[in-house]
Curated annotation (Swiss-Prot):
Entry keywords, A to Z: Antiviral defense
Record's function text: Probable cold shock-like component of antiviral defense system retron Se72, composed of a non-coding RNA (ncRNA), a reverse transcriptase (RT) and this protein. Expression of retron Se72 confers protection against bacteriophage lambda. At multiplicity of infection (MOI) of 0.02 cultures slow growth when infected with lambda but do not collapse, at MOI 2 cultures enter growth stasis.
Single GO term (MF): nucleic acid binding
Pfam short name (any one): CSD
Signal peptide from the UniProt entry: none
Domain CSD: 1-66
InterPro entries per UniProt: Cold_shock_CspA, CSP_DNA-bd, NA-bd_OB-fold
Record flagged with keyword Plastid: no
Protein's recorded name: Retron Se72 cold shock-like protein
GO biological process entries: defense response to virus
Length: 67
């Protein structure tokens, strides 16, 4: 698992980018968040933990949890 924070999120389109502690920003989609029984207000600046998944376009964040 990696740590970071939401650097950008578009509520209308449902995607954004997470600023990693090390490395480049990583793409995510709303559906990649694990809500664990409660709603999470996804907004710029929230701290998150996530796993990286390799795609044909690079890496994306998955299994994202608010810290």
């Amino acid at each position: 698992m990696e740590n970071g924070f939401v650097n950008f999120y578009d509520h209308v389109k449902g995607y954004g980018f997470i600023r990693r502690e090390r490395g480049r920003d990583v793409f995510f989609r709303y559906d990649d968040f694990l809500f664990l029984g409660h709603d999470v207000d996804i907004c710029k600046g929230i701290l998150v933990r996530f796993k990286l998944e390799k795609t044909d376009k690079g890496f994306k964040a998955v299994a994202i949890q608010k810290v």
